[in-house]
Amino acid sequence: HRMDPDTPLEETMGALDQIVRSGKALYVGLSNYDGETMKRAAAILEDLHCPFIINQNSYNIFNRTIEENGLKQAAADGKKGIISFSPLAQGMLTDRYLHGIPKDSRVNTDGRFLHADQFDEKRLNSIRSLNEIAAARGESLAQMALKWVIRDGVVTSVLIGASRPAQILENLKVLNSAPFTEEELKKIDQCALSL
């Protein structure tokens, strides 16, 4: 469920509880909540004896909102999972845009989520620098970006899209890749947070 700021939280959680009790869902999942609101929602659901196990939020090297709004810490403290959508930043964290915007990219064919103005020289340089870090790890940029999302165990899963089965198989290799060094994490932060 995605948060509706115009509906009282108690009403929303009550409706979600009814969905679970009626057998239409096994548990509650929340999407795009901040840390404080998630804690309040979790308390309401706990009082209702309704299982709540997962948060779904956008999270990637470039988008760290769940760190800034307290959700990541609140989920860890409350032993709730997080599933990250857009872990590759709509494809920005792949090798697809290392040399600019390809003619057949979603920027040109489907401009709903990714726009040409997001690819200024500063962003492209950041992507290229991140790619160099990935190469030094023996990984593709996509693999490193996925590893970064799940690096500390707080994010329990990622939603990945793929246009080819081979992409999924390549991305699964992150499950066996080496942990990041402190130096690598600092370099990643320098690349991403300089935007």
Segments (PLM) and residue ranges:
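Histidine-centered active-site/metal-ligand motif
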Residues: 1
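Beta/alpha (TIM)-barrel catalytic core signal, keyed to glycine-rich beta->alpha loops juxtaposed to Asp/Glu
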Residues: 4-195
